[in-house]
Amino acid sequence: VMIATSGDRLIDADAEQALRQLARRVDVITPNIPELAVLVGEQPASTFAEAVEQARHFNRGTATTVIVKGGHLTGTEVENAVVEPDGNITVVRAPRVETMNTHGTGCSLSSALATRIAAGDTVAEALQWSIKWLHEAIAHGVELRVGQPGGHGPVDHGYRARQV
């Protein structure tokens, strides 16, 4: 995590440069919109198309797949994408949930994605599963009654497990 949803920078410029170099050596990265902008040295994208182009710019010449997460953008639908180094793009959409229970969404998505990839899913399959799971976790986070009133509460990581 380089930049929080609040916009606060969580690391200094030297660490940002080190992360740029490290990110080019990993299989998959999951930056939020402000983090993606830092990785490519541009202003944060204001549209999904701009974010996808920034991801394509980043992974050009690398073997790194970039997950574009559209949660910081506006609209009734959240668009996310797997942007592969070979130019393949898979878009995964979910309805936007209007809630204050969004604390930890980026870390939760990254963890779910890594788990599904380790279980044998392709990155695209892993993102589809993870977005569906996270959408449910966000939608039901308010039922936890944590961080309220007025604060950002967590998503409900265990919602799906309790439905089994």
Model-based region annotation:
Residues 89-104:
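Short pre-catalytic strand/loop immediately N-terminal to key active-site residues, enriched for Gly-Thr
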